[in-house]
Amino acid sequence: HKAIRRQRQMCIRDSTNLYRDQLTRNGHPEWVYNAVKDSIHPETQLILNADDPLVSCFGYGRDNVVWFGAGNLPTDTKEFVGVYNDGAYCPHCKSPMTYSSYHYDHIGNYECPNCGLKRQDTSYTVTSADLEKGEITINNKYKIELTLKSLYNVYNLLAAFTVASITGVDGNTIAKSLSNYVLKNFRVVTFTLGNRKGTLVTSKHENSISYNQSLKLAASDKDKCDVLIIVDAVSRKYFTSDVSWLWDINFDLLKSDNVKNIVLAGTYCNDLATRFSFSKVDRNKIKVIKDIEEAVDYLDNDRKEKIYVITCFSDKGKFLEKVKVD
């Protein structure tokens, strides 16, 4: 908190974990919100995601706020899609909230009829997004090509663009620097397994909104694919075997014709299988293989379909050591 107070400028965006997460670490999003809010100096300039109602509360009653967000996107929905809706009630007055559109989960265009909390007009806006093509446009002018074709990544890039722009960097320079940016922390890794190509997406198990975006990345691939989900450890820091967060994840996203096989692996494979038994995914697509090496061997075949691996920081090395990292 002292470190935050020393900062005159602060960026709070959609990836700051103001979502449901592991109880042993983050408690509840509103608890985290209050802890951060109390640490913000009154003169701090905030850079906020206007599409997240809880994050937007940081700017409630403040003038020194720069807002970023997404405009109307082709993937928007009129109804909420997911397991739970953290945007159902206003984070400010707790009254029922209305949405004109959802980008994903509770991120979208919202308004509270009671207290007036609503999505603010944005200075930096994703005005178009073609995830299949892998391209977004900011403020109808700056085009950025995507390496990771997910809305979650779009918001990260938009936040980075906003911060760089308000600090004086030319927009064209920012767009060029961000285009085809590859994460250096191995959150997303491409690999080869025999004759098959694949992508490992590191997803925090307990953050269901992040996890949903990883599932959607696989499900929306226009090519056929197999999906390997590994839950071998729950936390790197805390000793816990709590897997209740599995029930917050929208595994129905894998009910897609392009997803041919789903392999569940790791210590908690049977917990995964139980969760999948309550999903709409075809049971015939699901195979449970506890041993990770055996799961890799099962996928090492002559098929040409791409492989998506979805796992956490603790478990990704257990898979990557068995394949050729590109």
Question: What are the functions of these language-model segments?
Answer:
Residues R6, D52-P53, K204-N207:
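Short beta->alpha connector loops
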Residues Q7, P42, G61-D63, S279-D282:
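Short, structured coil segments at secondary-structure junctions
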Residues Q7, G27, L158, S210-Q213:
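Generic recognition of short, well-ordered alpha-helical segments
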Residues H1-I12:
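Single conserved hydrophobic/aromatic residue that forms the stacking wall/gate
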Residues S15-G194:
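Acidic, Mg2+-coordinating active-site environments of NTP-dependent enzymes
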Residues R5, T24-R25, S56-G59, T77, ...:
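Short glycine-/acidic-enriched loop or helix-start segments at secondary-structure transitions
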Residues G87, K94, Y104-R119, T162-V169, ...:
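ATP-dependent carboxylate-amine ligase
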